[in-house]
Amino acid sequence: MKKTLITSIIILILCSYVVIIKFDIINKINNIGLNPKDAFYNLFLILKKEGIVETIYIVKKKFTHDLRLNGFDYSLSNKDSYPEIESNKKRLSLPLNKIIRKISSKETKESFGQSYLNDKWHRSHGGNSSAKYSVLEQINKKNIKNLEVAWKYKSLSNNINRYEIAGTANNILSENNLNVETNPIIIGNRMFVPTVDNHLLSINAVTGTLIWKIKLPYMVARRGLTWEENKDFSKSRLFVPSSKGVYAINAQSGKILKDFGNKGQIGNQLSLIAPIVTKESIIIALIKPAIEAYDTKTGKLLWSTSLIKKVKNDKNVFLTGAVPWGGMSFDEERKKIYVVTGNARPEVVGIKRPGDNKYSNSLLAIDLNSGKVDWSFQEVAHDLWDFDIASPPILATIEKNSKKIDVVVAVTKIGNTLLLDRDYGKPIFDAKFKIAPTSDIPGEKTAAYQPSFNLPEMFMDSTFTIKDVTNISEIQKKNILLKIQNSKMGFFETPSLEKKITLFGVSGGAQWTGASFNPFNSTIFIPYTRVPWQIIVNYTDLKLRDRNFSNFDGHNKYQLNCASCHGFNREGKYKADGNFFSSSLIGISFLNKKNNLDNFNNFKNMHSKIIPNQNLKKISSSDLNDIKNYIYKIDKLIDKEKAFGINGFWKKLVDNKNCPGSKPPWLFLKAINLETGKIIWNYEDPINSYMENSNKKDVSKCKKVPNYGFTMTTAGKIVFGIFGKKIKAFDIENGNLLWSYELDEDLSAPPSTYEYNGVQYITFVSSHTSNNITTFKLR
């Protein structure tokens, strides 16, 4: 006990030093609205709620990001010491394509039936199949125009102070985490839904009145929750993910069941997605180790499967594997758990995670009894673009060659629909992988092939071209053309120290919201965004970044003329989803980009499009020379200390009006027939939904374009698509718009549907500045 207390005090002192004293850390805190005093207070909250180990992890991740960087053990001034740069010539000598052949009809097993056909919504996403489908058909395409609001529930007032919300370190330190992303579950006339301030609610699903409300000590049900079937509701249990494992809660009373697991908890790490409950075990997904099974009766650990492979003897790398944060589904007959996984870490730069990074960016099947991986299918190998698979896998049954077969489906950020046989993980259509570009970063070893699927047809292409540049106005077009000048674009172009890359897919394509499947026409419905991003890689200073260098000649001129944009420590400044970006100057003396400092005309030409002319005129050739020498001298010192590292990040490409840098529309709903692999219809959300004063000739600023869309489908032959504040219902066969309704706030989770006393209801959750539930029925 004494040892633990001493350790806690030491950790608190060290973390306090990191958060409060180090200047660059304070800047990062202030960027999200926290001053050092608030940061210190929140550190106490983190320690109290997360424990020592998780606090260390969070502080490392949030603040000392350079601990995860790829540090160099060689000198940048000695090119002979550089690690090998990949040979493009050698890459091009390989076969153009690699094909994984489709499964034959003889190999496929007979279908066990459509287990997703039910009228219950006892697990988020509609059940263990995650199909977001219901057999309910009282509300259908003929009468949907008669929908009316049955009830509304508001759990919070507007204008929440996000820093008063006690949750995980992630929740406290995140800039924008005030969304309920869990679609409610309904048992009889009880609805269960979390709130943004870490409460779990039980609401009367017919009247919208509150039954009970409990607050958990950790972030609650971020992406889903599950009810365990029980004929005696008073003894039934909810399994609720949190930032500290999964809670078992009595569904009737809302009390934590302290006699289960570890005082009502199983697992001890961040869990985002809905657990799977079987007769013998409860399956949960954790950020680490990955997938765990616990005894249903006692909460005792049965097995634990890690999908993360740590790099030996490397303190700079946290993860090199996959995190199952997107979702999972369960096949009762096969006793298989299907999981999608995240990308490898560190992101963007993979020097110290060589190889394909097995199990990352993959769809996997895990045996229920043993926890062993039965098979895995990787979409993107050695990911450098944040192309993880975020959408929950869907279990569906389709017909091929007059034979019904069971498949698992996952839609991806780059526009692919992974359609695999559930038994062996083989594709239903040939899966083609095309030869991919090499990297110009020393030591980076890219994957030779990346996906280029023909069927199912891609619902989106991740490649950005000049033709995609915005056409909203000439001013906005010119602004984007300037931002992509000298940018790399093309099929899986790799991150570079010399150039940005511009692409679609960093935030979707398809995201965690997932797709829905309707068995009536074997069609999957995919909501997605098509908004461009840029990936930037730069050198970073791992040791000397906080040194003042005021004794160096040129220091004052740099601080006066350059620091406001490039930062006092030369790291650059940017906003991930904003218009502003200023590049890092660290290590520029070792890059071709130094020509912009070596040549006064180059410097003026480049900056004339960025800073006011009157400010530019104040900088003479002599001033630039002093500034250049100052920067180069620091670079030499960093190199001498072998303190250079490399870092990568991404930011949304937006124009000067804060609109996405690509041509509208930006949000879509697409329908793909899984038996043919063909797109059968497409809906494009109108641009005027996201423009301020869109009726005027002069385009003003864009409103925030929603990052994600949501969907749910029913036997009534309708599919609901959600875009921002708007709910829209479509005919599943042709995509005709049947009905729409606009709420006061953006919706933040897929809808749920249920029936009670012969009446079908559909419920929607919207959140951010408040927490609203709006439920409809036929009038």
Predicted regions and their residues:
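Repeat-blade elements of multi-bladed beta-propeller folds
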Residues: 121-125, 175-199, 220-246, 270-291, ...
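Beta-propeller blade signature
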Residues: 249, 290-301, 356-371, 421-425, ...
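N-terminal pre-domain segments of enzymes
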Residues: 25-137, 447-474, 480
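Extracytoplasmic electron-transfer domains, predominantly the class I c-type cytochrome c fold
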Residues: 336, 551-552, 559, 564, ...
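Electrostatic cytochrome c docking/interface patches
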Residues: 538-557, 573
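Short, conserved, GDST-rich strand-edge loop motifs in beta-rich repeat architectures
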Residues: 339-357, 531-546, 636-663
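Conserved blade-ending motifs and adjacent loop-strand segments that build the rim/top face
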Residues: 381-384, 389-392, 432-439, 500-513, ...
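Surface-exposed loop and turn segments in beta-propeller and other repeat-based domains
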Residues: 151-169, 216-218, 261-267, 304-318, ...
